[in-house]
């Protein structure tokens, strides 16, 4: 395979490459090799990690080239590290038989970790409505928590408006769209699955 074709193929793996901001930050931080057994998924991680064709391609890429972009994780109080960015890379590496992974370890608050986790995963090409719904809700709650701590005198309605807009920022959507997605989290699982299945028809 021509070298250019390999590069083009690798560039399509959104779970291997992170955002430009994250890459710049990684250059300023030390990458550590962490045993896979010490890495744990993010609590209530809203994005599915599926053993589909895309994962199979990622596993083959990891076997050939390794994990090209480090994971981001934070220390857990009980030991080990909680993955913030890189759940698919971790799963692919496990299937590929790797024993350690390159990881950037950061000390982060719960809210800051939620925001980074959501933002890094929203770079993926195909995201189910249910994933967006719970991700937006988690980010909205985290932003509200941060706002409540920094400005306890702000009116609740105004704070909600700003928070919705903050979640929408960078996604090319409006605060109203964010609210519509978040309302999906109130659906029973059967109805939420129907919404996801309908979206897959149009992918």
Stretches found by the model and what they are:
Residues 201-203:
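Conserved small/polar residues in nucleotide/adenosyl-binding loops
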Residues 190-191:
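Long, charged low-complexity interaction segments
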Residues 47, 91-186:
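Amphipathic, charge-rich alpha-helical segments that serve as recognition/docking helices
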């Amino acid at each position: 395979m021509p070298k250019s074709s390999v590069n083009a193929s690798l560039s399509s793996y959104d779970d291997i490459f992170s955002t430009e901001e994250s890459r710049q930050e990684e250059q300023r931080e030390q990458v550590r090799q962490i045993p896979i057994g010490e890495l744990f998924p993010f609590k209530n991680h809203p994005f599915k990690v599926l053993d589909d064709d895309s994962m199979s391609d990622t596993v083959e890429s990891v076997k050939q080239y390794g994990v090209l972009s480090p994971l981001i994780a934070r220390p857990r109080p009980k030991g080990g590290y909680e993955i913030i960015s890189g759940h698919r890379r971790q799963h692919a590496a496990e299937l590929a038989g790797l024993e350690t992974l390159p990881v950037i370890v950061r000390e982060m608050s719960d809210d800051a970790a939620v925001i980074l986790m959501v933002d890094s995963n929203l770079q993926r090409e195909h995201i189910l409505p249910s994933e967006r719904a719970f991700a937006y809700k988690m980010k909205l709650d985290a932003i509200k928590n941060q706002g409540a701590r920094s400005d306890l005198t702000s009116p609740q309605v105004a704070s909600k408006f700003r928070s919705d807009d903050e979640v929408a920022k960078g996604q090319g959507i409006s605060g109203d769209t964010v609210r519509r997605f978040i309302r999906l989290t109130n659906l029973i699982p059967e109805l939420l699955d129907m919404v996801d299945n309908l979206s897959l028809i149009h992918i």
